[in-house]
Amino acid sequence: MSQISAKDVKHLRDTTGVGMMDCKKALEETGGDMQKAVEYLRKKGAALAAKRADKDAREGIVCIALGDDHKAGAILELNCETDFVARGEMFTGFAQELVSLALAKHAESPEAVMGLELSEAYGCEKVEDAIKTMTGKLGEKIDLKRLMFFEAQDGIIEAYVHPGSQLGTMVQLVTDQPEKAKELAKDLAMQVAASAPLVTDRSKVPAEYIEKEIEIYRQQALGQGKQEKFIEKIVSGRIEKYYQEVVLTEQVFIKDNNTKVSDVLNEFRKAHQAQVDVKAFVRYQLGE
């Protein structure tokens, strides 16, 4: 067996990010051949990924990348098994690499990004293989749980990541004054993070769902012995409260408890003689 030098072990460690002892073992198994040692470690990572496929990966981070002109954005949730790994530079760097790739290639789902090649820093591996390699390096199951891409040729995209990177949001505005709308978009991204709306406006709430809610509230009122003449008003009030909870534009603005989000949008329109509407938003919270 050829002599394995510390220099070779360090070089392999720097190249792959795998632990020193595993690098030494790989070089020993491949007779000191650096390329074969790299392939050996990749196969070992794939084998470990297969072994850990049934493990729970509930820790991780939410990561976001925005284009320089804020016309595009990508958000993802990358999972691992422990909080220790989730906070490490290797894991967070990998998450940033993935979301940057998704942004650059306009990938709209985990499936869409799996066949794409990463940068030279990750050996130009395809994402699917790189996840296996990362599993080998970190010794934990790595799972790209979800990913979404926004594009706004007719507006602007802003984002917010809460400290700790376990909650992130993106908001897409349609506006003819994108530069002036940046601060508004940032505020709305924070609004989505804090208040967790489900839809942008009332029209997005399915009519059949509201009908079911009305019947539920009606039966509850009857069960409480409310008089028939008061029930309609009670039900209407509860439906309004529901809208205020789940509809973004109906929510109380986080920066002013006396103002609704819809009022903030109207104020912007008047102040800047501009058109602005919320086209879409996304909210990722770790584990949801």
Curated annotation (Swiss-Prot):
It comes from Chlorobium phaeobacteroides (strain DSM 266 / SMG 266 / 2430). Belongs to the EF-Ts family. GO terms for molecular function: translation elongation factor activity. One of its GO terms (cellular component) is cytoplasm. It is found in: Cytoplasm. HAMAP family: EF_Ts. Keywords: Cytoplasm, Elongation factor, Protein biosynthesis. Its main location: cytoplasm. Pfam families: EF_TS. CDD domains: UBA_EF-Ts. The gene is tsf. Associates with the EF-Tu.GDP complex and induces the exchange of GDP to GTP. It remains bound to the aminoacyl-tRNA.EF-Tu.GTP complex up to the GTP hydrolysis stage on the ribosome. The lineage of its organism: Bacteria, Pseudomonadati, Chlorobiota, Chlorobiia, Chlorobiales. The keyword Cytoplasm applies. Disulfide bonds: none annotated. Residues 82-85 are annotated as: Involved in Mg(2+) ion dislocation from EF-Tu. This is Elongation factor Ts.
